[in-house]
C-alpha cells in the first residue's frame, strides 16, 4: 500500500526530528 509506505517513511522522519517537537508540544 502506498499510504502504508508513506506512513512508514513519515514515522522514520518523526522518529528523528519530531521527538523534541512532541515534547515542546506537550
UniProtKB/Swiss-Prot annotation:
Listed name of the protein: Uncharacterized protein YHR073C-B
Native species of this protein? Saccharomyces cerevisiae (strain ATCC 204508 / S288c)
Amino acid at each position: 500500500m502506498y499510504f502504508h509506505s508513506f506512513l512508514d517513511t513519515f514515522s522514520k522522519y518523526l522518529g528523528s526530528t519530531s521527538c523534541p517537537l512532541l515534547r515542546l508540544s506537550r
